[in-house]
Amino acid sequence: MSEKILLIDGHSILNRAYYGLPNLTNWEGLHTNAVYGFLNIMTKVLEEEKPEYLAVAFDLHAPTFRHKMYDAYKGTRKPMPEELREQVPLIKEVLTAMKVAIVTMEGYEADDLLGTIAGMAEKKGIDATILSGDRDLLQLATDHVLIRIPKTKGGKTQIEDYHAKEVLETYQVTPAQIIELKSLMGDTADNIPGIPGVGEKTATKIIAAYGSIENAHEHLEEIKPNKAKESLRDHYDLAVLSKKLATIDTESPVEFSWEDARMGNLYTPEAYDYFKRLEFKNLLSRFDQQETEQKALPSWRIVEDFAEAENIWKQAEQAEQIGIAVIDGMDGVRGVAVALEDQNTVYFPVEGFQTEGVLCGHLEQLFAGDSQIGAWDVKAIRKKIEIPERKGIFDLGIGAYLLNPLKNDYTYDDVAKEYLGEQLPSQEEVFSGMKKPDPKKADNEQVAAYGAYQAYVALHGKDTLKKALQEAGMWDLFEDIEMPLVFTLDDMEKEGILVKGEELKLYGEKLEVRIRELEEKIYEEAGENFNINSPKQLGVILFEKMKMPGGKKTKTGYSTAADVLDKLAPDYPFVAAILEYRQLTKLKSTYADGLAGYIGADGRIHSTFNQTITATGRISSTEPNLQNIPVRMELGRLIRKVFVPRDGFVFLDADYSQIELRVLAHLSGDEMLIKAYREAQDIHRMTASQVFHIPFDEVTPLQRRNAKAVNFGIVYGISSFGLSQDLSITRKEAADYIEKYFATYPKIKSYLDGEVEKAKTDGYSLTMFGRRRPVPELKSSNFMQRSFGERIAMNSPIQGTAADIIKIAMIRVNQALRKENLRSRLVLQVHDELLIETAKEEVEQVSAILEREMRQAAVLSVPLEVDMHTGENWYEAK
C-alpha cells in the first residue's frame, strides 16, 4: 500500500473555522475559535487518512507573481477581521509546537506550494490528500491526488472528496478544464475577470464541447449563444489572462523536506502547553501521558483504621504545606481529604470512630497552626469549623478568579490543567453514571476520589498560583484584601439580617391592592381584559387598537420593552400605569413573596456574598440578592422597612459620597475636580455652572440634574446616545454636553483615552490596587463590541478601585468591631454602603470606627467622605 501525505491549505481552513465557530477567547483575551476549529478539522482528517507525512501551506502577506501580472488580482477581497488576523501567527506557533511542517514561499500562493508538493508526491509513488475550502484546487485532482473540501450542513462539518473521476462527474469537465472554466466565467473571490456575460452554465457547455479556450476561440463561429461568442471574440485577451491567473503553478521552486514532514507524535509537551494556554480542554485528552511527561493520576486511599488516622493527623499538624478539601453530605460533613507532600493523599469518611466532630476538631487544629494551607472555598469550610483570620491560608478559587475574572467557574481540574500541567478527571468524570454530579448521593469511592483530587490540587497548586499572582502584580491584592475579605463576608453571612415577617406580609398585601387597582384601570382604558404580562397582547392594544406612535414590529410582535414605554409614558397615562404595574408585580414576586422563603428559624435572612462573580471585583449577593432592592420608587424603597435591628439595637448606615467620581478625580489628576472636592463644593452644581456657562448661584435644579447625569455617565463611558436617552434630549445636545464637560475637565478626557490605549496594548485594565480586568472586546472587528470594550476600559479602573476601597473598609470595620469587643456587627454591604446593626450604647463608638476606617481605606488626592444615618429600620437609616 502506498504511503500518503496530507497537505493542508492553512489560510483556507483557518478562515473556514473562524466563520464556522462562535467567538472564543481564552483568559488572556486571545481569540481562539479559528485555531480551535482548524485543529479539530485537522485531527478529524488525520484520523481518517492516517498519512505518513503532513504539511501545512500558508500564504504570505506579500505580492505574488499573479499580482505582477494583474494589479487588481484579489483586489476586491475585504480585509481580514482583526480577530482572525491575530490567529494566523498563533496557529503557526501551535503547529510548530506539534512538529508539523509549515511551508511558505514569497511570490507564490499556498495553492502553488500544495500543487508542487502533490506533484512531487506522485512522482515518488506517494498518494496525496489536499484539504482546502477552495475549489480552485480541484484542478490538481488525479487518481492519486485527492481533494477534500469541508462544508457545513445542518450544523455539522461534512467533507466532499474529489479524485479526477468525481470532478468529471460533478462538473462535467476534467480537473485540468477547471482552469478553462475560470478563464471564461472568472472568479469573484480572487477578482479574476473572466469574460463579460459568461456564467458557470455557459462556460461548462463551451469547455465540455471544445476542451479549452484556445480551441473554443478557433471555433468561434460555432459558439452559442451569440452573446458568449461575441464576448469571447471581444475579450479573448481577458480569457487568456484569466487562465494564467487561475492556473496553479505545480513547478514552484519550493524547498520541501520529506523528513520534516514525516508524521511523528503531534501531542508534544510544547503543544500541551499551548493547548492549556488556549483552554482547549476537549483536545487535551489526545495527549499521551508519557510523551507529555504527564504524571500518573495522584494516588489516594481511604483511611478507616484508627491508629493510621491518628498517625496521619499528627503528621499533618507538623507539616509545613497542606492541601485540604471538605466534602458536604446530606446532613453535615461527609468526609475530609488531606494532601501532604511526603505521602499519598488520604480521605477520611465520616463513619465509625471518625465522627464529624472528630474530623472537624482535627481540621480546626490544622487551621489554628502555622502551616501553609491550600483549600477550596474557605468561606464554606468556615461555616463548619472555627478558622482564625491569619496569613498562610490560600483559597485556590479566589486565586484563580483574580488571574482570570472572566471565567464562570474555577474548578480543581481547570487549575490542574492550567497551572500544574496535569489532567485530572473532572467532577463529571468522577461522578460518571450520575445524571447530575452530586457528592451527597454518590458512593464512597467516588466521593473519596473527588475529595482527594481537590486536596491534591490545593496542595500543589497554591504555590504555582501564588507565583502567577506575584508575576501579575496581584499578590498584595490577594493577601491583603481578598483573603481577609473571606472572613468578613463569612461573619456577615452568619450574622444575617432580621426581617419582620408580619411587616413583609402586610407590604405584600399593600402591593396587591395597588396592583388590582392598576389592573382595573388598565382594562377600563383598553376597553377589554387582556394579559398585561403578554408583550404580544399589550403590543396590539398599544399600537393597533390605541394607535400610539413608535410601534416597532418584530417577528414576535411589537416591542413593549421598557425603553419603548418610557418614551410614551409622559404623554400617555395608560402607559405610565403599565410601567407601574410591571414594577409592582416584580416587587411583589421578588421581594414581598420572594424574601419570605429566605427567612430562617432565627427570623433572619442569611444572604450569600460572592467575591468571585463580577469581572470588576464588586461583591455580589445571592439567595437572596439584597443589593438590588429598588431605590427609585417610593413603594420600592418601603421594602427596607421590613429589615430591622434586634431589640436594644439600631441600624447605622454609612455610605461613601460620590466615591467613583472621587476616584476619577484622583486617577485623572484633573485640578479643577480635585479643587472642588477639597473645598467640599457641590460638584454637580459646579459642573452645571462650568458646562452651561452660568453663575454658580443661578444653576437651576434641572441643570444640576443634567450635570449630575453627565458626571456619573462619564464614569461609565456613556455615549451621546446613552446620555440623550437618560435626559430625554437630542443626541446632538447630549454630544454638546459631553464635549463641554471634557472642555471643563480636560485631564479626564486624556485619562479615559489613555486607559483605552493601555488596555488595547496590555489586553486588560488595572485598578489602583493592581486588579486586572481583561478586555478582549477591544480586539473585535465589530464596532459595537469594540465600543463596549472601550467603555469597559474606561470604567473598570474606576469601578474596580471603588470596589477595592469598600472591601478594605469592610475588612477594617469588621476587625475593629471585634478587636474592641463590641456587640455591634456589620450585616450588609450594598455597593458603596455599609449597614451596621449597632447596640444603642455603642452608636458613638461605631460611628467613629466607620468614619475612621472608611475615610482612611485609601489615600487619594481628594478626601473620601462618608454620609451616616441611624434608624429603627433600614428605610429610616438610609
Feature-to-residue mapping (PLM):
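Active-site-proximal helix-loop-helix substrate-binding element of RNase H-like nuclease domains
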Residues: 154-182, 298, 334-470, 481, ...
